[in-house]
């Protein structure tokens, strides 16, 4: 059963379109794959301190939010984020919603999906048509471990032996892709949604997913429906190094924690409001 179609405009916030909240402006910064360098974390911390309330919020889509923004700072905020490499496209900033397996390429999984995140982000930003995707439309790249496939993505790839299954609104479509063709298949599905939508924001709001024309003949695989979170603590990697996973109380980082993140080489924000 489909969800009701939307009748109002898409008001999903970004950095160019700030949401007016009770405590001031709210800007949402997309982090494809949740990836953030220490320098970028520092840029976000500085922006929040200078323009907002000094905190960062982590979201369930592995993005970050700056709250308490003063009126009229959108231009300066956007310039800062662009200089930090966090706003590569002004036209497509709200459609860069991409989840990815948190430990992909570090330990486990059928494939390293990190290069696919970068490829998908570039393809989205290069296509003028895809700027029309709703701000809540979500992509996910799961390397087969099942940590992000159950997060409610509209278009997802799920790692299987030899490639990926295309998962639409949580269901295996029967289409398969090699790593080389994986991103093209995701973009094809997104374009199909734009062709058939009539005010809907999400795939599960369509009356008939078959209208997308994205079905295939492959034997269906079981798609996990329960999120498999990465454990908290020190996690050994296949290269002999270790990753450290932690949770952020209430998903809110204060000035002290933000200062410490500057020294990190790479940070992965998780959909369960941790890193």
Region locations from a protein language model:
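Intrinsic, low-complexity N-terminal interaction/targeting segments
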Residues: 5-20
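Small-residue-enriched alpha-helical segments and adjacent helix-cap loops
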Residues: 2-5, 24-167, 172, 176-180, ...
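Flexible, glycine/charged-enriched surface loops at secondary-structure junctions
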Residues: 55-58, 130-134, 194-212, 218-230, ...
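A conserved active-site cap/scaffold subdomain adjacent to cofactor or substrate pockets
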Residues: 186, 190-193, 241, 246
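Serine/threonine-rich low-complexity intrinsically disordered regions
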Residues: 112, 189, 205-208
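Accessory "access/gating" subregions that flank catalytic or transport cores
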Residues: 214-252
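Short amphipathic beta-strand and strand-loop transition segments with alternating hydrophobic
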Residues: 16-18, 157, 234-235
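Short, well-ordered alpha-helical segments in soluble proteins
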Residues: 124, 190-197
């Amino acid at each position: 059963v489909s969800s009701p179609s939307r009748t109002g405009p898409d008001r999903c916030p970004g950095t160019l379109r700030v949401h007016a909240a009770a405590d001031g402006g709210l800007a949402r910064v997309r982090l494809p794959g949740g990836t953030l360098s220490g320098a970028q974390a520092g840029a976000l911390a500085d922006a929040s301190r200078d323009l907002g309330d000094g905190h960062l919020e982590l979201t369930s889509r592995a993005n970050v939010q700056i709250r308490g923004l003063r009126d009229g700072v959108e231009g300066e905020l956007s310039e800062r984020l662009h200089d930090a490499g966090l706003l590569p496209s002004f036209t497509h900033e709200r459609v860069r919603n991409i989840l990815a397996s948190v430990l992909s390429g570090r330990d486990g999984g059928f494939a390293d999906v990190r290069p696919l995140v970068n490829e998908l982000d570039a393809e989205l930003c290069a296509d003028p048509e895809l700027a029309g995707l709703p701000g809540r439309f979500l992509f996910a790249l799961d390397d087969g471990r099942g940590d992000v496939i159950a997060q409610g993505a509209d278009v997802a790839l799920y790692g299987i032996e030899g490639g990926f299954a295309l998962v639409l609104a949580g269901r295996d479509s029967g289409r398969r892709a090699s790593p080389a063709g994986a991103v093209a298949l995701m973009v094809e599905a997104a374009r199909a949604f734009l062709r058939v939508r009539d005010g809907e924001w999400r795939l599960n709001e369509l009356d008939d997913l078959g209208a997308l024309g994205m079905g295939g003949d492959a034997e269906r695989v079981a798609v996990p429906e329960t999120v498999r979170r990465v454990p908290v603590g020190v996690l050994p990697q296949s290269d002999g190094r270790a990753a450290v996973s932690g949770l952020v109380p209430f998903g809110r980082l204060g000035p002290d924690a933000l200062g410490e993140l500057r020294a990190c080489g790479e940070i992965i924000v998780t959909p369960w409001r941790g890193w």
